[in-house]
Amino acid sequence: MPRNRRLTSSLSRPIVLFLVLLPALFVILRGWNGFAYPSTVAPYSDLTLSHFTFIDYIRQQLLENYTFPLWFPTILSGTPLIANPLAGLWYPFGWPAFVLPLPFAFNLLVGLHLSWGALGMYLLLRQQRLGIAASLFGGLAFGLMPKLFAHYGAG
């Protein structure tokens, strides 16, 4: 058996799972006490100014009125909330943010999205018949890509 084959065959599913979940762990641990990237250096991002505000308002309306709000009255003279893609009403994977504590919910969702992308890249590379080690490297390269973290920092 070639040396490379032994190396890749020794990687088990738990190791693959850990490496694919590494981006999520990175974001969650980095932002354990607050936002992972919109920090005091860059406090004015879309995440802190719009997403956080929308989620907080939706959560308040769910607790007080037991319904999803269709209108957001605090910006200008009010804006439609149901048609605003930043509010996330129609994105099921963002719904945990309505019940989880903020900003932990944002860190968790961003981390899981990065891990989902890393898993997708890993599976794509495996489908292209690359080895396990090369596929893991590609998945991690995607999941830990600085450009994606820059997007998170910008909101």
Residues of each region from the PLM?
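Membrane-interfacial loop-to-helix junctions in multi-pass inner-membrane proteins
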Residues: 6-14, 40-44, 126-133
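Transmembrane-helix signature of polytopic, membrane-embedded enzymes
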Residues: 122-144
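Start-transfer (signal-anchor) and selected internal transmembrane alpha helices
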Residues: 1-32
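Membrane-interface coil-to-helix junctions
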Residues: 23-119, 140-155
